[in-house]
Amino acid sequence: MSTNSVVAYLRSDGAIVSSYVHYDGYETGVGMTLLEHYNSDERALAVSVGGYYSSLSEDLNESLEKSVHTEEVEMFDSMTEFEEYLMENSHLEFGYLWTGGKWMVSSWSRIGVGAAWNGFSWLVTSFVREGRKTVERFRDRARDDNREGRTEYDEYADELEVTIDKWHRYGMGEIATEAMAA
């Protein structure tokens, strides 16, 4: 099973270039990798023109070399066209878009037997929110295992929490800066 995503870059002419990522498309997977390793205009463009990634790591060349397929990049003439593509392809559970010097993320929510398109929001806030839920799930899993000492779940939760706290501080700083400028 996989969590599919698209990584995209909004060009200055309004066109969008994007690549597909097959595994770990959720915020604490691909999202965290984008924040940690592709969080500049140059790196965001580089990751968006890869075409296809089985999974995305901090090393772009390694990610391409380890991919089981190769595909051309997807091009869209406008944001409207890109959003329509995401909405028509619900197997793409997450869409990441570099625009205005930051990553945005789109996703779906399950509603009954269907799904609702959530649109785009700032990746930092989504990563912090979903990351905290993930940490709690891992801590619950570690407790449920009833093992003595620390488990790999505890260790991953600790590592993830450090990254979440860093991005939480960054996000709060950005919000404060915007509020002061208003």
Question: Across the structure, where does each feature detected by a protein language model lie?
Answer:
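Short beta-strand scaffold segments in enzyme catalytic cores
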Residues: 4-9
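Low-complexity intrinsically disordered segments
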Residues: 37-182
